Amino acid sequence: MSNLTQVANENINAESTSINFTKAQSLGEKLELGNPVFWLSGSFLTLFVVLAFTNTSALSELVNIGFNYSTQWFGAYWQVLLLLNFILGLVLALGRTGQVRLGALALPEMSTFKWMSIVLCTLLAGGGVFWAAAEPIAHFVSAPPFYGEADPQTKALNALSQSFMHWGFLAWAILGGLSSIVLMHLHYDKALPLKPRTLLYPVLGDRAINSWIGNVVDACSIVAVAAGTIGPIGFLGLQISYALSELFGISDSFATQSVVILFAIAMYTLSALSGVNKGIQLVSRYNIILSVCLIGYILVVGPTSFIVDGYLQGMGEMVDNFIPMALYRQDTAWLGGWTVFFWGWFLGYGPMMAIFIARISRGRTIRQMMVSISIVAPLVTCFWFSIVGGSGLAFELESPGVISSAFEGFNLPAVLLAITAQLPFPTLIAILFLILTTTFIVTTGDSMTYTISVVMTGTTEPNAAVRTFWGIIMGAVAIALISMGSGGISALQSFIVITAVPVSFILLPCLWHAPKIATQMAKEQGIA
């Protein structure tokens, strides 16, 4: 018996060695090193970082030329695209097609609260704190051309209204509306891959899936969403480092910024490794709970009347001028810095976010998806902007300069601290907001790490190696860019808009294919 045991142990050891060797050999396969999409997207990001290190001025000049060209020639197109996307989504939701159930499941995979938590936290990203604090005061200090100059009270309401336009219905609809309908049908009903290239299948057929066109489409989408995610990760390092310096005297240095980003990398990579139903869902849930607690606190001790009135009047003003604001074209320079910039940023997220929404929304109806993503989520977002940015405006109206002076020089990190400084227990509230900022970034980082991995591997459960690789890469690029000072992050911000040019054409066919698919599915499901 002992001889048999010895032989068995030797066989097990040999098999273990063989397995380890196979694993070592297959690491390249796990990372998809043979995938053209990996080399296309990875090479482009690498080239960007190398240029940023070796010749920042040349990179900035190239990016600025591309940015100006993109906003000048494609800005109007993007404005029309987002508006039509929102309107058609509402039409599908409110008509008989709204009853169509997507994802080949009779019931949703997760509860509505968990689902909405993930949706809200992923799509808001760090902008939910960065811009919620800074954008209203920016529009107050320098009035948007659509409204022009007015008395301080009116300027404050106009500032909220303009912020609501940028973070409201149109922005949310492009992130998970018509494109998700197309992807969910083609993936779950037609067994096509859950990749950006599938969005072009109704136009190009098999060429979109099997040719070089599909590789380019996937690579463009990955580069766009990586750039859009790297930016907030870098902002997180700048925000937390600045706050630690102001609150505790810790040096606001590259070392501090790097430590913050490394911590974020660890958090969102571990969350992505655990999957949608564990880490991503857990972080999102606690993120929402902390947000609700801060909302409740500010409503109790803050400028409650202005927050509520500002929200209602700002929303009313925005809805009343919805079409004119959405299609405003008179000041193209201002549009390039604000509306068109945001539209480019959100468009860049479009295909990959559609994949993520498709992954977590199985069993939901078109009406549930469209109303939740295009109506409910924007209303919640705008109320959050009223809580954070509205409080800042109220404090500014009461004591001119208390917020605007901190914002001088477009100092985004300083605005949040200036607002919390006016509240009871300012240090504690500032710390809670910084924690919230971090968890917002983590939910976006883990979701996009997961989604990029899905596209690279072609499976909804990508292996740990590829998830870890892309999680680390995005954080490493953020660290590399902030090491060069403001020039690196500024170049990336402008580059985000450039990536939206090809991505916007990937999303364009959804305007006519989503209604066609929804109508076809309504007939198949026996919906009169």
Can you say where each PLM-predicted feature lies in the sequence?
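Membrane-embedded translocation segments of transport machinery
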Residues: 208-216, 221-364, 371, 376-430
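Extracellular loop-to-transmembrane helix junctions
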Residues: 36-42, 68-85, 116, 157-188, ...
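Hydrophobic alpha-helical segments of multi-pass membrane transport proteins
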Residues: 44, 77-93, 291-302, 380-390, ...
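Flexible loop linkers connecting adjacent transmembrane helices
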Residues: 19-28, 61-67, 94-113, 137-161, ...
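Membrane-water interface regions at transmembrane-helix termini and the short interhelical loops
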Residues: 25-30, 56-70, 89-109, 159-167, ...
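Helix-loop-helix module between adjacent transmembrane segments
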Residues: 10-13, 20, 24, 28-53, ...
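Membrane-interface alpha-helices at helix entry/exit sites of multi-pass transporters
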Residues: 76, 150-159, 208-219, 253-258, ...
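N-terminal alpha-helical transmembrane segments of multi-pass membrane transport
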Residues: 2-155, 296, 508-522, 526-528
